[in-house]
């Protein structure tokens, strides 16, 4: 149980740390976003207020604002010639500088500014570095040390086929080659002339007959013969021994009932006393 509590606490601490880091990253990103939007808006207002361009000192002394933007529009519409807001001439030389204005009152010293935040990513700097008022262009630094050798690149495509070179000098006589394959058989030659007549051969007479040899092995059985005719009936055989008694048969059906018999003869006296007479008449 205690281990589970420690694990839960450790997990919660990790989650809180991640949330805190996420909030810090979000604040940094929002600061960069506000700085970029503020700078972009400043450039848009400056470009609209001073279409012909202006130096940075004028922008710093009289920074354009949202009210200046709409005030300039009204002045252009009301007094286009006095404010010199009409179409700008092209190719005209600059006029003489005007008289210096009255000296203004000295402003109060400003408070020390807060420490600056980290700069914008390099991609944003690369996009806005040509706009006036952007980052300071620093001279390139010294070249860094030589880096390590890169990996071997993939093999290049196959080159064009080279030209045929000049024929080489004639070589010396080579050694004997290996034995070739056997040739095809030649054509049959002509028949030769008949040979000389041979000497007469020895004549032999037939000898006496030899003894009979042992009998040969038994041959295979012959084919089956045709079926024979029906034989004659044989004599009657003797009477066989009596068989074993069979099982008792099923009881037969009951016969018809006989006729009633007549009255039997009186039996002998058993020695009993005579029966008493009846006391009433039927």
From Swiss-Prot:
Function: Nematode cuticles are composed largely of collagen-like proteins. The cuticle functions both as an exoskeleton and as a barrier to protect the worm from its environment.
Protein name as annotated: Cuticle collagen 8
Gene from which the chain derives: col-8
GO molecular function: structural constituent of cuticle
Pfam families (UniProt xref): Col_cuticle_N
Family assignment from sequence similarity: Belongs to the cuticular collagen family.
Signal peptide range in chain numbering: 1-24
Complex and partners: Collagen polypeptide chains are complexed within the cuticle by disulfide bonds and other types of covalent cross-links.
Region of interest called Triple-helical region, as start-end residue ranges on this chain: 95-124, 141-269
Low complexity composition-biased segments: 235-244
GO (cellular component) term, any one: collagen trimer
InterPro entries linked to this entry: Col_cuticle_N
Claim: Aminoacyl-tRNA synthetase is one of the keywords in the record: no
Matching PANTHER family: COLLAGEN, CUTICLE COLLAGEN 8
Ranges annotated as biased composition (Pro residues): 214-224
Ranges of biased composition (kind: Gly residues): 170-180, 225-234
Residues covered by region (Disordered): 86-282
Keywords: Collagen, Cuticle, Disulfide bond, Repeat, Signal
């Amino acid at each position: 149980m205690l281990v589970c509590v420690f694990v839960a606490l450790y997990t919660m601490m990790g989650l809180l740390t991640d949330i805190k880091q996420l909030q810090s990253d979000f604040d940094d990103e929002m600061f960069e976003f506000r700085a970029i939007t503020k700078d972009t808006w400043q450039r848009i207002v400056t470009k609209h207020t001073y279409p012909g361009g202006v130096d940075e000192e004028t922008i710093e002394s009289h920074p354009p604002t949202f009210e200046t933007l709409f005030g300039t529009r009204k002045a252009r519409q009301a007094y286009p010639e006095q404010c010199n807001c009409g179409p700008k001439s092209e190719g005209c030389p600059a006029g003489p500088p005007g008289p210096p204005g009255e000296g203004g009152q000295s402003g109060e010293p400003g408070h020390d500014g807060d420490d600056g935040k980290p700069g914008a990513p390099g991609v944003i700097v690369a996009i806005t570095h040509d706009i006036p008022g952007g980052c300071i262009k620093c001279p390139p630094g010294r070249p860094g040390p030589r880096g390590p050798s890169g990996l071997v690149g993939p093999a290049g495509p196959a080159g064009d086929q080279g030209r045929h070179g000049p024929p080489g000098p004639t070589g010396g006589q080579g050694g004997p080659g290996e034995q070739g394959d056997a040739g095809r058989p030649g054509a049959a030659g002509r028949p030769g002339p008949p040979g000389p007549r041979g000497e007469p051969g020895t004549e032999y007479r037939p000898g006496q007959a030899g003894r009979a040899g042992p009998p040969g092995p038994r041959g295979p059985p012959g084919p089956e013969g045709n079926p024979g005719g029906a034989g004659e009936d044989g004599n009657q055989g003797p009477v066989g021994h009596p068989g074993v008694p069979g099982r008792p048969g099923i009881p037969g059906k009951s016969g018809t009932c006989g006729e009633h018999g007549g009255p039997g003869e009186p039996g002998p006296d058993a020695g009993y006393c005579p029966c008493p007479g009846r006391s009433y008449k039927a």
